[in-house]
């Protein structure tokens, strides 16, 4: 058993933070949450900057942070990149890119959708759905390995390995649409995203995105390590940054 193997490794090297962290992952998968928290905390005692342990402890203990650590997101998706499409599309019946693409086309009507920025493009699943309807398609993502998979699809005019807020803060923005599928669930606090698009984009663009829905107020870090967002939270951002909400709906997006 994996847990026993980690314990043996720790008996030889008690300050092996990675073993504690990996043991936490295994215990969490087994549903032994209290033991998982204990293992993660031991990893943090040795390695305080352990992004995975820090984020998961927050998630399992009900502490909502503003955003997931960059290193956590990068490590998660770099490790997941090669099997991402197979796992999501075929096994989990992942529908978000198709839903977002269909919604965008319905809102836009006839003619080209112009220039689109795919925020957190991953392997390019949204790009495959939307490319034929726009004149320019760019993508950004934190995971280098996910971007390598996206390049193989050959649908993006430009791809950048960069954080969303960093890109929105520093790059020239001239887009008709900003789209994001299953990405804000790792961002949490969305104020900067809404503000930067509103204040820095050269044209009047639209933002189309998915979140995991919660009936609670605000946004919350769930035990899954993902953030959920309420409709009232999104409405408050629209009001604060002068957006108009054209559409809101809930739907089953994938098996879990």
What function would you assign to each model-found segment?
Residues 179:
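A conserved beta-strand element that flanks and buttresses the S-adenosyl-L-methionine
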């Amino acid at each position: 058993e994996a847990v026993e193997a980690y314990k043996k490794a720790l008996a030889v090297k008690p300050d092996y933070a990675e073993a504690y962290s990996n043991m936490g992952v295994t215990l969490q998968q087994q549903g032994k949450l209290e033991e998982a928290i204990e293992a993660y905390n031991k990893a943090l005692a040795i390695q305080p900057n352990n992004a995975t342990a820090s984020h998961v402890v927050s998630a399992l203990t009900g502490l909502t942070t503003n955003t997931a650590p960059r290193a956590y997101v990068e490590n998660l998706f770099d490790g997941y990149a090669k099997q991402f499409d197979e796992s999501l599309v075929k096994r989990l019946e992942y529908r978000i890119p198709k839903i977002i693409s269909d919604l965008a086309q319905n809102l836009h009507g006839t003619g080209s959708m112009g220039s689109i920025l795919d925020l957190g493009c991953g392997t390019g699943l949204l790009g495959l759905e939307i490319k034929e309807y726009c004149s320019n398609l760019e993508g950004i993502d934190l995971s280098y390995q996910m971007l390598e998979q996206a390049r193989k699809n050959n649908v993006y005019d430009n791809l950048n390995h960069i954080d969303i807020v960093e890109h929105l803060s520093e790059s020239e923005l001239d887009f008709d649409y900003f789209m994001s599928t299953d990405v804000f669930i790792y961002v949490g606090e969305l104020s900067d995203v809404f503000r930067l698009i509103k204040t820095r984009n050269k044209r009047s663009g639209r933002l189309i995105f998915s979140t995991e829905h919660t009936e609670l107020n605000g946004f919350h870090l769930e035990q899954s390590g993902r953030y959920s967002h309420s409709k009232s939270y999104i409405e408050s951002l629209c009001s604060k940054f002068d957006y108009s909400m054209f559409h809101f709906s809930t739907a089953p997006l994938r098996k879990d």
